[in-house]
Amino acid sequence: MKSLLTLGTLILISVSHAVAQQTSLQELVNHAAKTTIDRFAPQKLEEKQLSITLIDLRDPARPVTASFRGNERIYPASVSKLFYLVAAQRWLEDKKIEQTPELTRALRDMIVDSSNEATQYVVDVITHTTSGYELPPKEMEEWQHKRNAVNRYFASLGYTNININQKTFCEDAYGRESVSRGPNGENRNKLTTDATARLLMEIVTGKIANPARTALMMDLLKRDYSGRSSDTDDQGAGFTGLAFKGREGYRLWSKAGWTSTTRHDVAYVETPDGGKFVLATFTTDHSRDREIIPSVARVVLDGIKDVK
């Protein structure tokens, strides 16, 4: 009887340990969220203004995902350009569009410089639509169907709860772009941190494109976080990369986005001790609080090594 009790105790401990391992990444994400919300309480940061998704890629064949409000639909700003990059590479691979010097230049400027004008050109090419004056209802319906090509592509891959069919602008949309967006912005681009982190993970692991196109995308997303840029909104040094200050040996690939009301980043990080993870952090109504995103990243950097 005693041996049976001992065996039962060992099994219980083993099961409990397994459960703890399964939830530890989620606990890290919860801790990152709570720590950041508490730190920025004086700035009135609330739960509803923060979304986080973390994907542990130490075993790329078995990625583990945890999130905090990861399925909330949020205006993504320039993070949407990551989706247009992937769509363009897929279209090129499938020979739906042609590689031209202008498209090559635009894809580079869209990701490296986060150029809105380059993005507008890329959207024209991959959806076969153009901006301009308002169209009659029937023509507008046909135009909108074409513009939804990127949505249909990602839906075919199982992406849900997102909308990617709008150009990015420095100021505002006019004509058919404004009509498409809707009078109350109901058709604006929307992403979740879950979908965004998944996409970067699929780029990194080579699941979304062939090796040559994967290498091309990774090259465009590679960031220098050394702080040499004087731009506080530099994609390498002004977002997740801020968390690397005082740390050595890290590598960073990312796509950031920001407006007057939003500040986001999705980053793939490789640590000196072999850690690999994707971290997507979206914030709303705190675009001037540049430390929120690196605050989340620091907690993850400090805790990811302890996740089993």
What are these regions (language model features)?
Residues 3-69, 92-97, 140, 144, ...:
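N-terminal leader/targeting segments and the immediately adjacent pre-domain N-terminus
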Residues 21-36, 44-49, 188, 192, ...:
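Structured C-terminal helix/loop/strand segments within mature extracytoplasmic catalytic/sensor domains
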Residues 24-35, 47, 102-181, 189-194:
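Active-site-adjacent helix/loop patches that line small-molecule binding or acyl-intermediate pockets
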Residues 51-54, 77, 109, 121, ...:
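Structural recognition of the beta-strand scaffold that forms the well-ordered cores
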Residues 58-60, 73-75, 116-118, 128-129, ...:
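Solvent-exposed loop/turn segments at secondary-structure junctions
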Residues 75-97, 110, 279:
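Active-site SXXK
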Residues 86-94, 124, 198-205, 302:
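Short glycine/serine- and small hydrophobic-enriched flexible loop segments
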Residues 90-108, 119, 210-214:
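Short, well-structured active-site flanking segments
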